[in-house]
Amino acid sequence: MVEDGAEELEDLVHFSVSELPSRGYGVMEEIRRQGKLCDVTLKIGDHKFSAHRIVLAASIPYFHAMFTNDMMECKQDEIVMQGMDPSALEALINFAYNGNLAIDQQNVQSLLMGASFLQLQSIKDACCTFLRERLHPKNCLGVRQFAETMMCAVLYDAANSFIHQHFVEVSMSEEFLALPLEDVLELVSRDELNVKSEEQVFEAALAWVRYDREQRGPYLPELLSNIRLPLCRPQFLSDRVQQDDLVRCCHKCRDLVDEAKDYHLMPERRPHLPAFRTRPRCCTSIAGLIYAVGGLNSAGDSLNVVEVFDPIANCWERCRPMTTARSRVGVAVVNGLLYAIGGYDGQLRLSTVEAYNPETDTWTRVGSMNSKRSAMGTVVLDGQIYVCGGYDGNSSLSSVETYSPETDKWTVVTSMSSNRSAAGVTVFEGRIYVSGGHDGLQIFSSVEHYNHHTATWHPAAGMLNKRCRHGAASLGSKMFVCGGYDGSGFLSIAEMYSSVADQWCLIVPMHTRRSRVSLVASCGRLYAVGGYDGQSNLSSVEMYDPETDCWTFMAPMACHEGGVGVGCIPLLTI
């Protein structure tokens, strides 16, 4: 009964002690250490561990299923555990009580195996993270094998990527020399190996054979057939490969060396060689610094500004500007140098070229193209720069030129089948693919690719959407295009191409409509840089992760507002 003048109180009050569950687990842990109230014993060999069923069932899925589903063990006072390390089981029982676990190099594998058996996914993930963060050329092959055995897909992929990135160092390890033939064959055949030259792959394979010459000598022909000997220097083939005693005494090996030498001596025979043996390797999982070159400001003026993006730190930093302002510029990276090619300076289309050395932070003029051009596609294949199409101030171009850094000369090669300006151009599976673009009258969805061995162009499946001023890049076994302009609107849509199916399919669109966008691959992801959304130039950047099929905004450019050329210089030094 409430008296007159007294404050009316609610009939229901909720009271709680938030720390009670965690405090209760601590008390139960202490009781277990005293050996009191325990109702089950887990046995491994001569080791026995007492515990409480209720705690094990609450914390460990394996025991939850055992004790709540009327399994035979739920009535046993002592349960025999098979296939686990005793110290790992003890650590996981302690974890069930206090939520703490110490992971180190000595126990990580046994803990991961135990966690997998007991269905403790969070601990399994923590162990995988521990191993992934400590990958090294001396242990990565063993970690990969362990990850495969334990069906840890993320760790397996991380170890695989590490092996590809650090192949030269890995090939010098004891783990590599102890690999079975099947694993070595699989490894030396990978496109993703990060090597400065194919000669490093040859030396790795030969070292593996010589480690057990008597047993492995007969495997050399099979190994050499999976190495891209035609991509070795002629001098190396003659002075090193051909002179090796293991090669000289094997007829099949000598035939492979002759085939490689013919590649250099008789170019007309190149189309008849197995395609994979003449396809350069490309390690797309390496992190690289992304350079944004030239472009436009908000007033539409061409810029000479250059800035560099670190995708790991997610930050931009300004570096030395070019000697010439260039928008719609072609950008290529060869031998650690960044080339700015052609473009538009605000008054004229340019044929001039300059190269940036990041080690000295300097720009140097190099040989000019034969034609003035802006809005062309620029790629690198077999150490040569190719520029495709573009606009010379009067019309769209079909012409193609290639530049040799060794001779500092440009050479005209076979023209495309169509005049194409603002097309997407990328190297994919050893061929130059040109997608979309326009000829001044119409915008294309068509695609063609160039075989540099035969100097011929061939059609490929057209994109689902016609587009020009879009970004194009390859990543792994797929080719991607994004953004652009279709004649009526600015695009955010993106597509992916598979050469096996010769077919395009849509992927998730970007968050922003982007015409004049540049697309570049780094560290296994794609970066869409800048562009124009129909109202203003863009400084924003989006990153696409093919594993999640998601675009994520990254740090925006600091000094640019769209229309930039981009190039990526790998961070990893071989």
Curated annotation (Swiss-Prot):
Q: Which SUPFAM superfamilies match?
A: Kelch motif, POZ domain
Keywords for this protein: Cell cycle, Cell division, Kelch repeat, Mitosis, Repeat, Ubl conjugation pathway
Its domain of life reads Eukaryota
GO CC term, one of those recorded: Cul3-RING ubiquitin ligase complex
Instruction: Domain (BTB): give its ranges.
Output: 66-105
Keyword Signal included in the entry's annotation: no
Task: Please name the pathway.
Answer: Protein modification; protein ubiquitination
**UniProt xrefs under Gene3D superfamilies:** 1.25.40.420, Kelch-type beta propeller, Potassium Channel Kv1.1, Chain A
Question: A GO term (biological process) for this protein?
Answer: protein ubiquitination
Domain spans labelled BACK: 140-242
Q: How does it assemble?
A: Interacts with AURKA. Interacts (via BTB domain) with CUL3. Interacts (via kelch repeats) with UNC119.
What is this protein identified as?
A: Kelch-like protein 18
**Which organism does this sequence originate in?**
Homo sapiens
